[in-house]
Swiss-Prot record:
Required for formate dehydrogenase (FDH) activity. Acts as a sulfur carrier protein that transfers sulfur from IscS to the molybdenum cofactor prior to its insertion into FDH. One of its GO terms (cellular component) is cytoplasm. It is found in: Cytoplasm. SUPFAM superfamilies: Cytidine deaminase-like (SSF53927). Keywords: Cytoplasm, Molybdenum cofactor biosynthesis. Mo-bis(molybdopterin guanine dinucleotide) binds at residues 268-273. The active site is at residue 122. It comes from the Bacteria. The lineage of its organism: Bacteria, Pseudomonadati, Myxococcota, Myxococcia, Myxococcales. This is Sulfur carrier protein FdhD.
Amino acid sequence: METSLRRAAAPAGAVAERTVLRNGGTVRDAVAVEEPLEIRVDGDRLATTMRTPGADGDLALGFLFAEGIISGVEDVGTVIHCGRPGEEGYGNVMDVRSAAGMRIDPERILEGRRFVPVSAACGVCGRLSIDHLMERIRTLPAGEPVAPALVAAGMEILARSQPVFERTGGLHAAVLVGRDGAPIASAEDVGRHNAVDKVVGAALRAGRVGPRAAAGPAPALLAVSGRAGFEIVQKAAAAGVPVIASVSAPSSLAVDLARAAGVTLCGFVRGERMNVYANGERLGLTGP
């Protein structure tokens, strides 16, 4: 299967330099930038996450979509940074405005759930209960089979989509891949949940995800660095992505949710060798 292996470029503002001690002397070293991003809806603060600057609008869209606060880009009029260039803190507040004739209403969606600001390692914090999440998660149909070769191809694309990690060793990454093996979106971030939100948001904008997606084939694979936790599976299911591949292990909750949601969950992927924790029949396998 042919894949796009062109290396991605690092986004502006994602890398900083700091002086460090090394071998008895001092050198300037590249480190990944971590800054807060406040997400607002129609001017009202909803959440704050620690993220790496870059694709902030996609992060906000992906986050709101995964939470069920928006159903697609049709709900959104504008996504803008607040303030003016040059002002202190400019670029660290995103305001998502409702489309004309629409009203994005987080309070209605989040009613009955305790919602608090999130961090890069939030996981399932801020939710009233895991049971509530299980009840509202989207269940994917069996759909068409996916070749194990696509999983291997997705991990190759992931490895080539981490320019900031190559310079700093300090970020997570995520890529969405189509059934043809072509990348749809890629992103890096200090938080793996943020990286997934960024690629889902990019796919939303491109018309590849959402109830009215029509710009091309839907994503068939989400490849992520690090472990696959509960929230990664939730975000993939919300976006209708049938297969998740991770270089590391999933958590127990991730496995349980993947099985319930009809998502194929692969861990410890090394080429076409992998552990399949849920819904292996989509890959032509029998078992979990």
